[in-house]
Amino acid sequence: MGGRVSVELPKRDPPPGVPTDEMLLNVDKMHDVIAPAKLLEYVHIGPLAKDKEDKVKKRYPEFRLVNTGPGGLSALLRQSYNGTAPNCCRTFNRTHYWKKDGKISDKYEEGAVLESCWPDVHDTGKCDVDLFDWCQGDTFDRNICHQWIGSAFNRSDRTVEGQQSLINLYNKMQTLCSKDASVPICESFLHHLRAHNTEDSKEMIDYILRQQSADFKQKYMRCSYPTRDKLEESLKYAEPRECWDPECSNANVNFLLTRNYNNLGLCNIVRCNTSVNNLQMDKTSSLRLSCGLSNSDRFSTVPVNRAKVVQHNIKHSFDLKLHLISLLSLLVIWILIVAI
């Protein structure tokens, strides 16, 4: 029987551990990484000492601190969005902000607390109450209010809460604008109603405009509420009144009733220079000129002096030589006879 032979292998110390990417993370340098996290999304923040946990929780109150591994490895789990409507709704570019001592900033500074805005906050109706009031005040941004009203007609939120918010907004806008449609937010509302181009939107436009005061109609709606003389004059023309009435061509289209707006869209208005060579008129004829005007007065409401226009055209028209025309006619007839 042979004996056993044992070999003693050399001993070596194990190689030093190599930290993983997660272990190299530093929560104090991750402000811009943590803030955009979506609802229920984990953000790994690396090892976190016990004495820093309270500080991190205070800085990120919208997140729950979660242990993910040995050595204090941790992560933050988003649970909520704490941004307020005034800070989130009155701009379309803000996703979060940092609040400290009652002041907000887009950049983190020591001691600040993160407050985040709901994703697509303008698409969910969460801004309707705040912006409805703000857009009637003295400090509103007209572009923001115009975009918000426009977005209301294209929302993808089909939840019960979202649809109810939209209905409430339409009702409040209708009530507000029926009193005075010249309010900027109402003019935007009428503009987007017109662009929406449905039967319901057209009916709402006409309802709102018909509720306006007599002063409003006299100032802004003279196309939709013409004088008796203007209506009688319109009987002389085959084209719609909206095509030649300066009160229509100069009108704010947001304040036109639907029938006037549609008629105006049928017009083919051309500005040109006119030369009349031969003009015959009687007592029932009517002459209206709109050509040759500058851009500033191209829709001038000053009446045309028809007698002077006719006299000017006759004076400058070429003189017809009837005897010469007769001779030419006889010559043509003779040539035709000879040719046959």
Swiss-Prot record:
Sequence intervals crossing the membrane: 320-340
InterPro entries: Pox_virus_G9/A16 (IPR004251)
Single Gene Ontology BP annotation: symbiont entry into host cell
Keyword Cell membrane: no
N-myristoyl glycine lipid attachment residues: 2
Topological category with respect to the lipid bilayer: Single-pass type II membrane protein
A matching Pfam family: Pox_G9-A16
Stretches of the chain found on the membrane's Virion surface side: 2-319
GO CC annotation, single: virion membrane
Keywords from the named record: Fusion of virus membrane with host cell membrane, Fusion of virus membrane with host membrane, Late protein, Lipoprotein, Membrane, Myristate, Signal-anchor, Transmembrane, Transmembrane helix, Viral envelope protein, Viral penetration into host cytoplasm, Virion, Virus entry into host cell
Location relative to the cell: Virion membrane
Post-translational modifications: Unglycosylated because produced in viral factories instead of the classic ER -Golgi route.
Broad class of the protein's primary localization: virion
Family membership: Belongs to the orthopoxvirus OPG086 family.
Oligomeric and partner information: Interacts with OPG143. Component of the entry fusion complex (EFC) composed of OPG053, OPG076, OPG086, OPG094, OPG095, OPG099, OPG107, OPG143, OPG104, OPG147 and OPG155. Except for OPG095 and OPG053, each of the EFC proteins is required for assembly or stability of the complex.
Function: Component of the entry fusion complex (EFC), which consists of 11 proteins. During cell infection, this complex mediates entry of the virion core into the host cytoplasm by a two-step mechanism consisting of lipid mixing of the viral and cellular membranes and subsequent pore formation.
Protein name: Entry-fusion complex protein OPG094
Organism: Vaccinia virus (strain Ankara) (VACV)
Gene: OPG094
